[in-house]
């Protein structure tokens, strides 16, 4: 990171979107700065005087990283407030790169899709620490309340080797509200026409008015009590979810030493299935799904900045979590107690004005104790399955930065798994600012992932098909990317255009095969080819003051081998078109936001022939539109907002196959590609004091 100082101005030029959160303010004291604050190429901040403890940089819109070699963008709080944003999963409505889809029509499990591939290939980070692994993955997007988030950083393609070897298609990093920020109390209340209510309260305190020590309390409650069955198939469209979530965060500073720490706990009860009054054949009971979750986590960061010309720093970071889940799918059972521990030691130093070296050690441990029954037979005992993996590793990363015009970054990791042995992770990124208009980025690198298939995909138990799981190896893939950003001046405006292409090639992949046998779901290693081509172009402009417009188009070509046949990945839209408009006129008291998306058609798993000769379902689905709008009115200490989602009213027809007999092997709720519920309206209030 380069700092150029003048009398009343601090100019920060960022080398990467996801950087350690240590910079120097003009007074020379170390300050805590959200990484999103340094996402742009060069940002100028007017400082009121020489004695500065914090640097705060705010923008209302999404910021694309222009300074770093990694292709990424930061979604700031103003962007998150353009929609209801009840949780992390609802934060990407306006983002053309990230899709969030239901994994099945019964449990409400959602997954992120990036570069046309599922969320398990996207590394999830909280404050730059790996989080929400294994059994937390199916419902993790609902574990981060929207009101708690300060920003979200999304990087596509290969990430830095600093954060591990797992990111194959990108990273999503969540930055929470900061204890050291200005003291205030915040509230958020939300209610929807679907019977969902949320309440959030956040407060921070500077201990005894001390600018060197602060704490923060984040609380969240939600309750979705409605038994809504809009399509009349006898099943709830949305699960009943009651969640309690609390987190306590701490910050302290002494000279060149900085500490961040947090502890948190979550309790969630999720109930869904057939609604009362629905009769099953042969007097069978109602089919119900009940999932109880208790989660506990803690994290810490210790950092020290040395007083030398190299601006060297050392940091010790880590987090631990325990995720306990008891799930019943009819008479099937999946209970898991998962424990994870992660630690990282990082040293960074400048080797002159243009060279930077980062080295570090890491240790990750996953332990899963699972009790499983895969059939609807209460007389059968559960089977115990234990998965345990410990992975120590080391990395080195070199960055060459020539006046922010040319940045080259190369990194190498070596890790050793007690299950899969030793493996290497090379990654490289290049950024070249050709002129004031065009910026080119290139990336290439490898990623690995250890599959915990039932933990990560236990929603497949909501299918009546027989589940067959083979011996699974470590997933392994290469990813290559190229992107070009254009900053085109038009009169006194700037048209921003970004075009990018990414190619992901799997050497081994965990394949979930719905195609080979209509009565079976087979989970096995890849036997053949698997790849993803993704092309995206997006453009944004502010034609008049207060009006932001964005248009984007993305095309996905995703193929994998299922049962010896190379096929398009099922339930994956071939393309997506997106248009967003945000208008904040005059004094900024009103804000109007709208997002229109056209999701392209795709393939469903191979159907089978029913007794009457008809197909069990269509093998393809057509494109469908969605429209979201929101209006916000700002007041001195609060804001009122109201809006609607999926106002086009599109609903997937027959999202649950065989709903008339959920205890049979023809029942399947996992073939979901689009919205399950129709239009929804909501209203809420945000307050701060």
Over which residues does each language-model region extend?
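C-terminal beta-signal and adjacent terminal beta-strands/loops
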Residues: 26, 549, 598-607, 631-689
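Flexible loop and strand-edge segments within Gram-negative outer membrane beta-barrel domains
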Residues: 27-28, 35, 224-245, 253-314, ...
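N-terminal periplasmic "start-of-domain" segments of outer-membrane beta-barrel proteins
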Residues: 36-40, 50-83, 111, 152
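Extracytoplasmic beta-strand/coil segments of soluble accessory domains associated
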Residues: 89-130
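Short acidic/polar hinge/loop motifs at secondary-structure boundaries
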Residues: 111, 129-156, 246
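Short strand-turn segments of transmembrane beta-barrel domains in outer membranes
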Residues: 158-161, 171, 176-206, 236-239
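Membrane-embedded beta-barrel scaffold of Gram-negative outer-membrane proteins
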Residues: 313-327, 433, 441, 473-531
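Gram-negative outer-membrane beta-barrel transporters
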Residues: 401-403, 497, 501-505, 525-607, ...
């Amino acid at each position: 990171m380069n700092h150029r100082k003048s009398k009343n101005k601090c100019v920060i030029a960022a080398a990467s979107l996801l950087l350690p959160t240590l910079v120097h303010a003009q007074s020379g004291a170390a300050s805590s700065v959200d990484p999103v604050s340094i996402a742009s190429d060069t940002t100028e901040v007017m400082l009121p005087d020489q004695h500065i403890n914090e640097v705060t940089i705010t923008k209302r819109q999404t910021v694309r990283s222009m300074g770093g070699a990694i292709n990424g963008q930061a979604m700031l709080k103003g962007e998150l407030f353009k929609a209801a944003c009840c949780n992390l999963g609802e934060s990407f409505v306006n983002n053309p790169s990230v899709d969030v889809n239901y994994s099945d029509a019964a449990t409400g499990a959602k997954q992120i899709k990036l570069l046309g591939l599922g969320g398990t290939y996207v590394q999830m980070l909280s404050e730059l620490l790996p989080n929400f692994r294994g059994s937390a993955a199916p419902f993790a997007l609902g574990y981060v309340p929207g009101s708690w988030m300060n920003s979200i950083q999304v990087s596509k393609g290969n990430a830095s080797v600093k954060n591990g070897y797992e990111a194959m298609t990108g990273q999503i990093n969540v930055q929470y509200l900061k204890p050291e920020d200005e003291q205030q109390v915040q509230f958020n209340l939300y209610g929807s026409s679907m019977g969902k209510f949320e309440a959030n309260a956040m407060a921070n305190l500077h201990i005894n008015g001390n600018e060197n020590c602060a704490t923060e309390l984040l609380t969240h409650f939600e309750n979705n009590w409605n038994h809504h069955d809009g399509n009349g198939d006898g099943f709830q469209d949305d699960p009943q979810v009651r969640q309690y979530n609390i987190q306590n965060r701490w910050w302290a500073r002494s000279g060149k030493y900085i500490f961040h720490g947090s502890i948190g706990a979550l309790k969630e009860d999720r109930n869904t299935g057939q609604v009362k009054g629905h009769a099953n054949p042969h007097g069978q009971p109602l089919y119900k799904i009940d999932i109880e979750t208790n989660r506990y986590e803690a994290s810490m960061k210790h950092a020290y900045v040395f007083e030398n010309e190299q601006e060297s720093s050392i940091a010790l970071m880590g987090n631990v979590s325990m995720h306990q889940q008891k799930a019943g799918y009819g008479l099937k059972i999946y209970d898991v107690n998962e424990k994870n521990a992660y630690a990282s030691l990082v040293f960074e130093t400048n080797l002159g004005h243009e060279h930077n070296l980062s080295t570090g050690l890491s240790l990750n441990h996953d332990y899963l104790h699972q009790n499983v029954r895969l059939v609807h037979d209460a007389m059968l005992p559960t089977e115990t399955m234990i998965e345990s993996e410990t992975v120590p590793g080391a990395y080195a990363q070199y960055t060459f930065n020539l006046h922010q015009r040319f940045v080259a970054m190369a990194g190498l990791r070596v890790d050793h798994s007690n299950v899969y042995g030793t493996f290497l992770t090379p990654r490289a990124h290049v950024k070249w600012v050709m002129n004031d208009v065009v910026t080119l980025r290139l990336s290439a690198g490898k990623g690995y992932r250890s599959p915990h298939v039932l933990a990560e995909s236990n929603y497949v138990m909501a299918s009546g098909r027989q589940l067959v799981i083979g011996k699974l190896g470590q997933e392994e893939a290469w990813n290559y990317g190229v992107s070009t950003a254009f900053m085109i001046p038009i009169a006194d405006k700037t048209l921003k255009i970004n075009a990018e292409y990414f190619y992901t090639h799997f050497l081994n992949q965990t394949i979930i095969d719905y195609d080979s046998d209509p009565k079976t779901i087979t989970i096995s290693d890849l036997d053949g080819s698997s790849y993803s081509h993704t092309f995206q172009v997006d453009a944004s402009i502010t034609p008049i003051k207060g009006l932001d417009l964005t248009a984007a188009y993305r095309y996905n070509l995703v193929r994998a081998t299922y049962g010896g046949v190379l096929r398009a990945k099922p339930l994956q839209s071939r393309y997506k078109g997106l248009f967003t408009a945000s208008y904040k006129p005059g004094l900024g008291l009103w804000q109007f936001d709208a997002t229109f998306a056209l999701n392209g058609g795709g393939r469903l798993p191979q159907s089978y022939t029913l007794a009457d000769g008809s197909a069990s379902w269509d093998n393809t689905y057509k494109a469908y539109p969605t429209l979201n709008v929101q209006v916000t009115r700002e007041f001195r200490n609060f804001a009122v907002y109201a809006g609607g989602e999926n106002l086009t009213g599109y609903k997937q027809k027959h999202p649950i196959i065989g709903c008339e007999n959920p205890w049979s092997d023809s029942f399947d709720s996992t073939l979901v590609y689009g919205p399950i519920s129709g239009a929804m309206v909501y209203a809420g209030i945000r307050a701060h004091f």
